[in-house]
Amino acid sequence: MTAIVDIIGREILDSRGNPTVEVDVVLEDGAVGRAAVPSGASTGAHEAVELRDGDKERYFGKGVLKAVEAVNGEIFDALGGMDAEQQVQIDEIMIGLDGTPNKSRLGANAILGVSLAVAKAAAESFDMPLYRYVGGTSARTLPVPMMNIINGGVHADNPIDFQEFMIMPIGAPSFSEALRMGAEVFHTLKKSLHDEGHNTNVGDEGGFAPNLKSADEALTYIMRAIEKAGYKPGEDIALALDPASSEFFKNGSYVYEGEKKARNIDAQAKYLAELVGRYPIVSIEDGMAEDDFEGWKQVTELIGDKCQLVGDDLFVTNVERLSDGIKNGRANSILIKVNQIGTLTETLAAIEMAYKAGYTAVMSHRSGETEDSTIADLAVASNCGQIKTGSLARADRTAKYNQLLRIEQELGGQAKFAGRAALKAFRYLD
């Protein structure tokens, strides 16, 4: 019934107009699973490798025909006839077939597309939603959204050094209400920026990209927008940051171009602590650079009991890097990006390891996205309680929010919104 009879890869476009891989997996009973693979702009040095063609005459070298060829050729040859419900074995076969530590031969984009499409095909065959197929009967927690409403760094053409300024509606009673609260703040912020002469065009992830010079200036605008929308900062809606510090860590210092200032490792950790003291910031992602292990240890000791410290480039959804971080006291949370590691099995293993260590997990999109909403289902399947999938603009972002609305409606009275409990491990929310 669930035997794989065909795997079809193709080249499609992501939200930035760059090629990416989409895969259909067809089963013997006619069930079809489809998955499209995202792509990042600020990528960690230790991520699994997405395979690009390198042909400068085509998409400036960013084509993915080699990855598509791997899907339609080697990977299908290896997986044809297998049962789609054998997810772990299927993923292990693809990892072995690739034969490299970072999936660089076949491409993580090829392998992930197949891995996710297999799971979706199996779910379709069993007539189950993906979140239920992957997560079982306990999958019913709707995540708190981290909504990226001001963009900076490599996600926007402006002077702000930090990459993302986010709001988290922790005080909402349901996911649908959290979405409404976030949308109201988003539109209030847009009006405030417009009225003060700022550009209200949006960046890669749907947030505004005004010409502000510092994190303080961006946070002040957001605080005012929360209040103008009728909410209490820190009680109804909290703040979250993604500095993406690896992008501006140079020769042992954090170089703030917008502020025309450099901070050493000690100063960077103290600066983040100061921001947490001045604003209701409950989560900071990549506050230190990916290989600044001493900096990570410092900031974790300094504010780890007051703030969720999320490792993205630090961990790259990799159990080996996560295990090392846990042993050495780096961070207290992991960002989960399926394309950083390249298979569903490895993604779920990273989440499980985080949970066992008392770390939180945040399901995440990439800046180059598609209409694929798989991560919405995976957030519910894993009961991770938090999702980061952009702003309240651009269909590639709202596709995930809309899928979560559907899931909440489908679950009905069984649905549970994570709310403040998503961050219950940290005393500032007790």
Swiss-Prot record:
Cofactor dependency: Mg(2+)
Pathway: Carbohydrate degradation; glycolysis; pyruvate from D-glyceraldehyde 3-phosphate: step 4/5
Active site per the UniProt annotation: E205, K337
Entry keywords, A to Z: Cytoplasm, Glycolysis, Lyase, Magnesium, Metal-binding, Secreted
Pfam families xrefs: Enolase_C, Enolase_N
GO MF entry, a single one: phosphopyruvate hydratase activity
Gene Ontology cellular-component annotations: cell surface; extracellular region; phosphopyruvate hydratase complex
Catalysis: reaction(s): (2R)-2-phosphoglycerate = phosphoenolpyruvate + H2O
Family per similarity comment: Belongs to the enolase family.
Name of this chain's protein: Enolase
Organism: Rhodopseudomonas palustris (strain BisB18)
Gene that encodes it: eno
